[in-house]
Amino acid sequence: MVHIFTLSKTVYNTTLSKMNERPDIDIPGDYESIRSETLQFLEKASKNFSNLNSEELYQMKIKFIRGGTIKSFPIWNLLNGPIADAIYHTGQIVSFRRTTGNPIDSSVNVFMGSYR
């Protein structure tokens, strides 16, 4: 869960043109806070992206700082980087829940983000 948290934070920080510090030291200590903040980051990032025009989106960069070294990458790297990685790990969580007898409620519509 912490890894998905940091991935969602990276996506959100990118929408603010904010630096992503590695390693991330600002991580909540309990499951509920991690889950809640992860969902909030994704919701806020979605809203921020929908307010951008194509030129603003094109100019946006993902920025990282690690040990004093700064690196930046095109916004498109969010797709094959943090977003793809978060989807992959979410699938792992779903699989683990099934194998331990705790599957996700079948009335959940993942595509719509709602219950049927």
Predicted regions and their residues:
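Acidic/histidine-rich alpha-helical segments that form the ligand environment
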Residues: 29-66, 70-95
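Short, contiguous alpha-helical
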Residues: 1-24, 65-116
